[in-house]
């Protein structure tokens, strides 16, 4: 009785994979929405898709400039790669087409993310070590200073 109210779902056609590791990368919510949409429209065999900023913006309810900002963030994080395309119109003119997005393997982005974290931690440790040495040097100078005569 209960099953007749639910439509049958084809798990191959009605879903798209979103790696769990994406949530550990610290992406902004807008970048996550844009990445999710690109995963939704990608060709699963070539890992590529064509979409304009306007099309993505309409899908995720953002302006094209905001989409451009989040696409830049995704490129910097190493999640996607963009390539400019061009089209030839019927009257023979060459015009800019939409971007070709290539979704890169998530493992590279995760490795880059953790390498950046480790580099930041190393820098902070080095700064702390230098601060302690400077404090010790200043304290030693104060102890060795001659009292005024």
Q: Language-model segments: what does each one mean?
A:
Residues 65-134:
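Winged-helix/helix-turn-helix nucleic-acid-interaction surface
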């Amino acid at each position: 009785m209960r099953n007749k109210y639910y439509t049958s779902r084809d798990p191959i056609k009605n879903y798209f994979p979103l790696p769990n590791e994406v949530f550990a990368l610290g992406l902004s919510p807008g970048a996550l929405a844009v990445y999710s949409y690109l995963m939704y429209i990608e060709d699963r065999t070539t890992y590529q898709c064509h979409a304009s900023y306007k099309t993505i913006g309409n899908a995720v309810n953002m302006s094209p400039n905001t989409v451009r900002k989040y696409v830049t963030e995704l490129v910097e994080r190493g999640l996607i790669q963009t390539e400019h395309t061009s089209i030839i119109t019927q009257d023979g003119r060459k015009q800019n087409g939409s971007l070709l997005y290539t979704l890169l393997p998530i493992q590279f982005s995760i490795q880059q993310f953790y390498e950046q974290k480790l580099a930041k931690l190393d820098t902070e440790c080095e700064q702390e070590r230098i601060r302690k040495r400077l404090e010790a040097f200043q304290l030693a100078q104060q102890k060795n200073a001659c009292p005024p005569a």
